[in-house]
Amino acid sequence: MNYLADNPRRLLMKREHPDFFRVQRDLEAAGMTFSAIGNRFLLDRPELLQVQCSRSLTEPEIQSRVAFFLAAARQGAVLVSPAISPGEKAVMRAAFDAGFPLVYLQENGFTDLAKPGGRRMEACANGQLLILAPWAHHNENLAIRRGQCLALNDIARRLCERR
């Protein structure tokens, strides 16, 4: 779809759900503080399920994990992950494509005027996506480090064990 031709539709989405498209600062969950974009009420859903997959999974094992997590999402679970490993990416992509609710953790925070783009904007408008950033925004194009990956997975675990 042409970007300019799509402007009126995107504006309508932002007007109908303004809170889903504003950066929310100091959002508290499970004793932690985040910057967020999207449907913060996903954190209040009864079941949050962490998606964490070993990098050593084979393709058939990844497909098995995808099936497992999609079945849980069909039953109402909100999937939570930084989507780092190939398996985590496959699960979150399949769930996103199917329209299931997701909480995505990202390493880089948000600028004040940040907005989700493309299909993420659609997902936010539908209330199916929450993007959380536990750390401040940086302009440098930095590769994520192992310690950050471990921390993001620990944050996902803590969000899911909050009760």
What are the residue ranges of the model-derived segments?
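Short catalytic/metal-binding and nucleic-acid-binding patches
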Residues: 1-32
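Glycine-biased, small-residue-rich flexible motifs in mid-sequence functional cores and linkers
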Residues: 23-163
